[in-house]
Amino acid sequence: MSELLDLPRRILEDLDGAVVGKRELKRLLLIGMLAGGHVLIEGPPGTGKTTTARAFCQALGGVFKRIQFTPDMLPSDVTGFYLYRTDGDSRFIEGPVFANVVLADELNRTTPRTQAALLESMAEGQVTIEGVTHTLPRPMMVIGSQMPYGGPGTYPLTTVQADRFLLHGWSGMPSVEEEREIVGAIDRIERNIVNPVVGPQAILDLRREVAMVHVSPLIVQYILSLLEVIRAHDAVAEPVSPRVGIALFKASRAAAYLDGRDFVLPDDVKALFTSVVYHRLVLKPESEADGRTREDVVRATLEAAVVPRGQEFEG
């Protein structure tokens, strides 16, 4: 491990000064960044989704853009458009998706067509406007926030769209102690500005180090076992895609790196399984009618899959 490992720890320290609590969510954002993926944050209004995401974006440095999604937004408001002049010439006006870190706020407040414009750019790393392809900056990370499904005026992401996010995190209500701290220190919190800790090149360097973390064949088999069990669960309507296994592989490496290890343990996989699979999971209508939840399916899967024990996981 190199001195680069100190950078994620410094980001966490700065986030703690700007956002009360939410330690698990902060760690999840870091894992997403290190793994080269995008993160979807879900929670009710006023629980710090935007505040946490904005502070994290500030700490990452580079070019930061925020998109406040609304029902009347067009795809061109996200990706950009060509501006034509009277003499026949044109120039491309970049949309807010052209950034190193994009905060997609209240993503499920806009129409599926506009959602797709963002999510396709996330998957491809480029946008095509009027037949011309424009490459997005590297690195490019999207942090999406959304209201809980079923809220008024929401457009739930499709399974394919949700699959573009590596991880899903919850932003729940603060504890009594956390809420007391928030209320008592609100002036300081609102004034706090998170200074950039890293930049685009440092993020790319960190990702290269994460890619060197060893993943034992036993860990790979454990990941595949989890996929096999959850696909066979009688409450699941659609088998989860192979992207789940890939996401779990990448996120587990990032978690191990964040903990100062150059190898993955089964506990890394177990700890991240819910965040990787939850937003990709679709239950049968009759299962939901019976009161079964995605949490139930995830819990049953973790209990059923055989965890490798007493083995050598180091490379």
Predicted regions and their residues:
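Pre-Walker A (pre-P-loop) alpha-helix and adjacent loop at the N terminus of AAA/AAA+ ATPase modules
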Residues: 3-44
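Conserved AAA+ ATPase small/helical "lid" subdomain
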Residues: 193-248
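Canonical AAA+ ATPase core
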Residues: 85-88, 106-110, 114, 122-213, ...
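Walker B catalytic acidic pair
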Residues: 43, 105-106, 117
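Conserved alpha-helical scaffold flanking the Walker A/P-loop in AAA+ ATPase domains
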Residues: 28-31, 84-103
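C-terminal engagement/docking regions of AAA+ P-loop ATPases
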Residues: 232-315
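Walker A/P-loop
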Residues: 33-70
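AAA+/P-loop NTPase substrate/partner-engagement loops
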Residues: 59-87
